[in-house]
A protein has these predicted regions:
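A generic secondary-structure signal
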Residues: 69-72, 150
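Contiguous beta-strand/loop segments that form the cofactor/metal-binding neighborhood of enzyme cores
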Residues: 64-65, 77, 82-86, 91-236, ...
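Beta-strand-loop-alpha-helix segment that lines the small-molecule cofactor/substrate pocket
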Residues: 6, 11-59, 73, 317
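N-terminal Rossmann-like NAD(P) cofactor-binding module of classical short-chain dehydrogenase/reductase
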Residues: 1-3
């Protein structure tokens, strides 16, 4: 079963699918609340069904090569990561003509709401759900999870140690509630050793496309550019600066990460790219072999934790952490969401 419904429905439909004995491909985000994340994770582990999450970078050759390169040790310790996803598309996630035509009798509104509190029918929330919480968080649900998932994959870390976020609706004041511009800052590292780690800065805007989609991993020796698929010494320690401190130059040898990119198209009507088709193919192969797929349930759970932390940072304005014992998000020192 392929589940590509509204963001808030993914986990609920996934639970129903695996409990009914079906293997499932579940689009991202796996879940944007911790209760849904825990429910789908439990259901998959208890049923043993093959579940692939739609974070398709895990099935792209260039990202797989990047993971191997970092694991080899040649790159050195990650010191920072920069991620962007910028578009300039006023109609992104908008369907005004269809909204105008839709009537409640054309839908099963109560079924659509699932486990959300009841509210009166709203055609915008049915069709343009990505613009409205709690149906979606917008940018974090749709785009951030793709990119932050690579951090977990490349490092083996389960989730951020902390998240802060800022942003707003700065241009597209069309009745939406989810931000059109945001920046989130993540602290990553061993959960039991605060002396080690690195920062991830994620920024996204829907108001100007300069910068496009980028993921830049930095070490003291250089940069891993997953947009250009290059390993370079850019930013690495130069001899002139290291010499005064008794240090040698540390600059990576520049070369291509992979001859051919398996990247992801950020367009609104991109069709099927190599990464997506590869992710579906990997799932189908694992349905036959019963092996663990590339974007397995634990990967989905990890990106859901990072997503829930980010949503809490957006909604609370607080610094957000994660209570591993309780498997709950903490904002400003208290469990989130507030009861």
């Amino acid at each position: 079963m392929i589940i590509a419904t509204a963001d808030f429905q993914h986990a609920q439909h996934g639970v129903a699918a695996v409990r009914a004995g079906k293997d499932a491909y579940i689009e991202k985000p796996l879940a944007h609340t911790m209760s849904d994340a825990q429910n789908i994770r439990r259901a998959v582990l208890e049923t043993g069904k093959v579940v692939q999450v739609g974070t398709q970078r895990r099935s792209a050759a260039n990202y797989q090569r990047a993971k191997d390169f970092i694991a080899s040790g040649e790159f050195g310790d990650i010191v920072s990561v920069e991620m962007t996803w910028n578009v300039n598309q006023p109609g992104r996630w908008r369907r005004p003509a269809l909204v105008e035509k839709l009537r409640e009798e054309d839908t099963d509104w109560k079924l659509f709401l699932g486990n959300l509190p009841f509210e009166a029918f709203d055609p915008r929330k049915y069709i343009e759900y990505r613009l409205f919480w709690p149906y979606s968080s917008g940018i974090p649900d749709q785009w951030m999870v793709h990119q932050i998932d690579t951090v977990h994959w490349f490092t083996g870390l389960p989730h951020p140690r902390s998240v802060t976020a800022n942003g707003g609706i700065y241009l597209w004041r069309d009745g939406r509630k989810n931000w059109d511009t945001m920046t989130a800052v993540f602290d990553y590292g061993p959960l039991n050793d605060a002396t080690k780690g690195f920062q991830v800065v994620y920024s996204s805007r829907q108001t100007n496309s300069a910068g496009d989609v980028k993921e830049l991993y930095h070490s003291n020796g250089g940069t891993l550019d997953l947009d250009k698929n290059l390993i370079t010494g850019e930013g690495g320690l130069e001899e002139s600066y290291g010499k005064a401190m008794g240090m040698k130059a540390n600059q990576l040898r520049s070369r291509a990460l992979l001859e051919k990119s398996g990247g992801v198209d950020s367009g609104a009507h991109a069709g099927v790219d190599e990464a997506t088709s590869g992710n579906v193919r990997n799932w189908m192969e694992c349905v036959r072999s019963r092996k663990m797929p590339n974007a397995h349930i634990e990967a989905g759970y990890s990106h859901s934790v990072a997503l829930c932390m980010t949503i809490a940072a957006i909604q609370s304005g607080e610094r957000v952490t994660f209570d591993d014992a309780k498997q709950q998000v903490v904002a400003g020192g208290a469990l989130w969401p507030r009861l």
